Design a protein with these regions (language model features):
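Acetyl-CoA-dependent GNAT
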Residues: 2-78, 82, 89-99, 128, ...
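Conserved hydrophobic beta-strand within the GNAT/NAT acetyltransferase core sheet
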Residues: 70, 104-108
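Residue-level recognition of the GNAT/N-acetyltransferase active site
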Residues: 76, 80, 109-111, 136
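Short glycine-rich hinge loops at helix-strand junctions in the catalytic core
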Residues: 83, 123
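Short glycine/proline-centered loop/turn elements that form peptide/ligand docking sites
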Residues: 89, 112-115, 132-137
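Conserved catalytic-core motifs of GNAT/GCN5-like acyltransferases
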Residues: 107, 125-143
Length: 151
């Protein structure tokens, strides 16, 4: 990882930076309330990536028994294609494994080719499709999973 990068635990103090990345990354962004709700959950994993003292990406999810669900992952537009999303994903899988998770699940828009390529490269496989699950624009949701017993 780059010398100027570190992972942090995210909380409400990071809300402004999270919202800035979220709103530029997704057609249907999470609200402040969505983030605050997740932060309050004991099962939540909320990790940010800091580069040169700036929040450049985040990954959010939660553990349920032996499963971890990756709920959201985003990198600021100007920091994409530098491997930050891969680093965030690996960090989340490691933290989930340390909490006892054996499997990771996620859902991704069918049209999000960059995210699907990332997940394919990191060992996820499509296991189901939620037809017309997303609106604005209408899109299918691809359910993906992978084992995290071995990283």
């Amino acid at each position: 990882m780059c010398d100027e990068c570190c992972f942090i635990h995210l909380g409400s103090v990071h809300l402004q930076g999270l919202m800035a990345i979220e709103q530029r990354s997704f057609a249907s962004p999470w609200s402040e309330g969505d983030f605050l709700y997740l932060f309050a959950q004991d099962s939540a994993l909320c990790v940010g990536l800091i580069h040169a003292e700036e929040l450049v990406g985040y990954a959010l999810g939660y553990c349920a028994a032996r499963d971890f669900h990756l709920a959201s992952l985003a990198v600021a537009l100007e920091f994409r294609r530098r491997g930050f999303a891969s680093r965030l994903l690996q960090q989340m899988l490691l933290r989930a494994k340390l909490r006892g998770a054996e499997r990771c699940t996620l859902e991704v828009r069918a049209a999000n080719r960059a995210a699907r390529l990332l997940y394919d490269k990191t060992g996820f496989r499509a296991v189901d499709v939620r037809t017309a699950h997303y609106s604005g624009p209408r899109d299918d949701g691809i359910i993906m999973e992978r084992s995290i017993e071995i990283l």
